[in-house]
Amino acid sequence: MTTCTLYGKTKKTLTDAVGAAVFALLLLQPVLDVISYWATVFECSAITTLARFAMFALVMLYAFLISDRKRTYIIFAAALCLFWIAHMIACFKAPGGYKSPVADAGDFLRTVQMPFFTLAFITCFKKSDRVPSYVQAGFLVNMILMMHFLILSYMTGTQIYTYVDARVGLMGWANVHNSQSAILAFVVPLILFYIYKMKKPVLFYFTALICFVDLFFVGTRVDYFSIPIIGIAMIFFLIVSKEKNPAYYVTLGAIVVLCLICFNSSVVNSNLYNHSVNMSTKQSYIDDTLEEIHTPSGNPLPSHIDKETFDSLPPRAKYEILKIYELYAGPMVQRFGFERVFEEYNYSLKVSELTAVRNQKKLFAKMVWDDSNLLTKCFGYEYSNMVVDYKTVDKDGVESVTQVIYDLENDFPAIYYMGGYVGFAFYIAFLAYFALLIIVGLITRFKKLFTLESGMVGVTFVLMLGIAQYAGYVLRRPNASIYLSVILAYIYWLTAVRENVKLRDIFKIFSKNRNF
């Protein structure tokens, strides 16, 4: 048997199993998340990290073997390798040199998995029209698995709450709560579509109720506000699909309205209240301190001042403000100095602004960026720049060092700073390609693409981008970004494969021949 013959048979065997392979890969995700949680508990998380990288390598090898366009994979990999080389050069040229190449490489590999997985899933979708059904079924089984793991965590008394200190919110076993809550929102639209296709109304009502109740009790704002978005979108596209059974609309509408009416009893509202009380307590300390400080004109110091007012204060007053900043933004003050941090906060003395974690991380990243040279801004700075070894001294004079990580939660700013102008442009262009496929497809083939299936895929895509920007932990967390990869490949299949949509079709709109 020749090598070509053996390869041909191997490729056919692998291609025939493509649907099952995608299904198995999706089912593996919640299992890996649980294993990762327990590995962290037992301080052996490196094992699961290696397992995910091994899975990534195997998936890419599988997709490469069955692909008819291997050159695309090679070009894609070569482009990213060139970018990584340029990024490393920028890190070496940066002040202080390349501090932690290993940690930086790990962050890079986590970030680039999404586009690579997308390429692999596109290959899988192109090989079989049954893959979309496997994806829908995979999302359903994933939700079932996640719910069973949640129940098991409570049965064993090992559950983790969404908000640990307040002990509220159903989370189960999860390392990164933002990612887990995002995943739960991601899978619901296609689950509802999959069950709807079965034409079993009672099963659909039950599934919708369970999914939305789960999102309600998880307790994150992401999941809570996903309920009306998904519910209203489902109702709208059922209308588009000319569904005649009014029970679908009544049931979905009733569940959404019930969740909205019960906001005051929700975990989200409880957490907002607890946060407000906590902020009031902390603000009282600042207010008590500010009562002793007055402007040169004798007026009490407001919660926002300007540089001129600050410069006019006596040394004792400046020292009190310094102590406030050291208390609530100590690592930032140690890294950049008090005056610069005070200026970045626009001379604020409001505790809600000083202690907002996302805002702290954004300001920290911005200051690191401002200190970077042009080469670094082109290709991004390294991950270790977001880490501070914060030194403190207790009342007995004993010094301790705590590692504080300011890694950005919001994905797009993180990619901008870590990837620079070039990396960010590549990432945005990659996502924009699929968005343009949707736009061109709707303009040129509206009736064929404006369907319930396309609508649920589109809603999932919009949710993913919104959550990546405003909540984060999607694009740079492989356990969440793999779902985005699936949806991007699904979009490609709906448009470029099934309807033969091409970006250049947009120019045909202005031509006399509009046969698409």
Can you annotate each of these PLM segments?
Residues 133-160, 175-241, 259-269:
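Alpha-helical transmembrane segments of multi-pass inner-membrane proteins
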Residues 241-349, 370-372:
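A membrane-periplasm/extracellular boundary helix in multi-pass inner-membrane enzymes
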Residues 36-48, 205-243, 258-274, 287, ...:
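Helix-loop-helix junctions and helix-breaking kinks within/between transmembrane helices
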